[in-house]
Amino acid sequence: MISNTNFLPDVQDVAHSFSQAAKNYDQVAGLQRLVADQLITKGAGLYQGRVLDIGSGTGYVSAKLANLEAVTKVTGLDIAQGMIDYAQSCHHNSKLNWQLGDAQQIPLALPGHASTYDLVTSSLAIQWCKNLDAVFSGVAHCLTEDGFFHCATLGPQTLHQLKWAWGQVDNYQHVNEFVPLEVLRKALKNHFVEVSVECRPIELKYKSVQQLTKDLKQLGASNHNAYAAQGLMGVGRLRKMVQAYESLRDEKGQLPVTYEVYYIKAKTKVVV
């Protein structure tokens, strides 16, 4: 079993965090929309028939896919009830339906859906899953023989500037950690063929560290790690972290924030 248990929290913590963020999520989800749009563009030709969107969130990707003529049905699966409720209230295309469930338990969340979907997609969601093997096993379970898995997730260089700044203060883990590429590839190859992973760093600019940390909190993406430093976010420590990050300002006076994005494409492994 390939898991991410050293990095990530209890699944209910993630569900609660994103439910709380649902109503304000789209207001600060610039990166999420950018990655989602790139994912859809890269998947041109794949999006057809019946589609499952894992970690559908506010429904941004699901709704876009439902507008494609070649797509006949889109199921949005999310672990956060708040996200499901918000998506249902915002999107009313008859091709859409929503399901509460855990990406690590797809057969349980979608009973009777074996070999049902022509495509499973996911944009910036599976990085929150402890057990990648369970995720990919579930994806393979519900794909048709000629089906594809197409998703975007985050790599370990994500927010490396923020990690560095905290590293100038102490040795505790203040920033989310994500699995390295070799672990991701190994998990994928257990269940799929023709696996390809494109790594594309995306750098955003912020005016202040405070705005960055506020956005992360509003997105429900502040530190979820099981080994996150508890009781170590005092004013003095925060001030030192901010001072360290300030040293990274560029010539235009902006602070760099990097996200390491992995774009994945894989095909169903046919068992003979």
Language-model regions, residue ranges each:
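A short glycine-rich, Lys/Arg-flanked "PGG" loop and its adjoining helix->strand segment in the class I
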Residues: 133-145
